[in-house]
């Protein structure tokens, strides 16, 4: 919650009136949708939609579902989550488009450590530095857990820091709590 609150209230230039194009504003992509309650709470308190709508979480016909989707029409949701690994690839495309259109704003994307086991993640990890996408910030929630158990037991990936540095990323570690 702290990380998303800091991004939406202190770091990112974002407009709760929301338009999907995001011209002239920073964009946040939520790739690890299973932690959606935190994301929805930040969006509601930032003014993207009424806070009272949070009480409808996962109810039939609610716009606040277990995994955010663009289909629900909820302001602040730019991509559907659920298919792990897509967020960074979409972020690369958006960062490249912003640069090509002369928009100097930043794309932020949040992923989970279990999600790092998806092949598409590594294509994006190679693509971004190769194309000098300096307007892209990838955040990995490295909590050591995924749906099938501890990430080290499901599929050991080793040091994310070492891998991303080897691909040409500037890497920073932080305690997000």
What is the meaning of each model-derived region?
Residues 31, 110, 139-141, 174:
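Generic beta-strand/beta-sheet core signal
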Residues 49, 53, 135, 156:
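Short acidic-hydrophobic sequence patches enriched in Asp/Glu that either
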Residues 72-76, 141-145, 162-168:
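Gly-rich Lys/Arg/Thr-decorated short loops/hinges at beta-loop-alpha junctions or inter-strand turns
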Residues 1-130:
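Cofactor-binding active-site loop characterized by glycine-rich and histidine/acidic residues
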Residues 121, 141-143, 176:
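Histidine- and/or cysteine-centered catalytic micro-motif in compact active-site loops
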Residues 106, 134-137, 170:
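Residues at the starts of beta-strands that form the adenosine-phosphate
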Residues 130-154:
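A short, conserved beta-to-alpha structural element at the edge of catalytic cores
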Residues 102-103, 152-177:
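Conserved thiamine diphosphate
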């Amino acid at each position: 919650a702290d990380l998303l609150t800091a991004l939406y209230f202190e770091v990112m230039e974002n407009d709760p009136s929301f338009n999907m194009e995001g011209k002239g504003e920073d964009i946040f992509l939520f790739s690890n949708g299973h932690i959606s309650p935190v994301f929805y709470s930040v969006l509601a308190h930032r003014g993207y939609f009424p806070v009272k709508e949070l009480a409808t979480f996962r109810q039939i016909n609610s716009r606040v579902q277990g995994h955010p989707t663009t289909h629900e029409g909820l302001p602040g949701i730019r991509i559907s989550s659920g298919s792990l690994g897509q967020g960074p690839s979409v972020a690369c495309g958006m960062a490249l488009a912003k640069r090509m259109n002369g928009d100097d704003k930043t794309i932020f994307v949040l992923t989970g450590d279990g999600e790092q086991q998806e092949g598409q993640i590594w294509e994006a990890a190679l693509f971004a530095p190769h194309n000098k996408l300096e307007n892209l910030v990838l955040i990995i929630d490295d909590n050591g857990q995924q749906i099938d158990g501890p990430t080290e037991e499901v599929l050991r990936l080793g040091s994310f820091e070492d891998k991303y540095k080897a691909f040409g990323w500037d890497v920073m570690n932080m305690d997000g709590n």
